[in-house]
C-alpha cells in the first residue's frame, strides 16, 4: 500500500487533487481510500458536542478547541497515530491511501516510521 500525503494552505484544492487522483487510480483498477487526519476530530465534535458539520466561525472554533487546545495539547500525535493504526490493521484493503490534510512534519515521519511507502 502506498500512502500519498498532500499538504497546502486551507481552501487551495487539496481535496480536489485527492479526488482527481482517486478517479485516475480507480480507472486503472486500483483500490483507493481518501481519509483525513481530521476525520476522527469531526466525528468527536459531531457525536459528543453536537456539531452540525458546518465550518462557519463557531464550527471552526469548536474544531480548533477540541483538536488543538484539548487533544493536541494532551497527545500531539493522537490524530496521526490513529490513522496509522487503522491503516496497519486494514492495509490489505487498499492499494493507495490519500491523506489530503497533512500539516505537520510528524504526520509525514509517523507514516514513514510505521512502514508505509509514502
Task: Cite the ranges covered by each PLM segment.
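Extreme N-terminal starter segment of soluble prokaryotic enzymes
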Residues: 1-4
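P-loop (Walker A) phosphate-binding loop of NTP-binding proteins
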Residues: 8-9
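Conserved lysine of the Walker
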Residues: 14
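Hydrophobic positions on the alpha1 helix immediately C-terminal to the Walker A/P-loop
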Residues: 17
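Active-site signature of alpha/beta-hydrolase-fold catalytic machinery across serine-
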Residues: 20
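ATP-dependent small-molecule kinase phosphotransfer cores
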Residues: 30-95
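Surface-exposed amphipathic alpha-helices with a cationic face
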Residues: 88-91, 108-113
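Conserved phosphate-donor/acceptor-positioning beta-strand/loop module used by diverse small-molecule
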Residues: 96-103, 110-118
Amino acid at each position: 500500500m502506498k500512502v500519498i500525503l498532500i499538504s497546502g494552505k486551507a481552501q487551495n484544492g487539496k481535496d480536489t487533487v485527492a479526488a482527481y487522483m482517486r478517479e485516475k487510480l480507480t480507472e486503472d483498477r486500483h483500490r483507493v481510500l481518501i481519509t483525513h487526519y481530521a476525520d476522527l476530530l469531526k466525528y468527536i465534535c459531531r457525536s459528543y458536542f453536537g456539531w452540525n458539520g458546518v465550518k462557519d466561525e463557531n464550527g471552526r472554533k469548536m474544531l480548533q478547541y477540541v483538536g488543538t487546545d484539548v487533544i493536541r495539547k494532551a497527545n500531539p500525535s493522537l490524530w496521526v497515530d490513529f490513522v496509522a493504526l487503522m491503516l496497519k490493521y486494514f492495509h490489505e484493503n487498499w492499494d493507495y491511501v490519500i491523506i489530503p490534510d497533512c500539516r505537520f512534519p510528524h504526520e509525514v515521519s509517523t507514516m514513514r516510521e510505521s512502514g508505509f511507502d509514502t
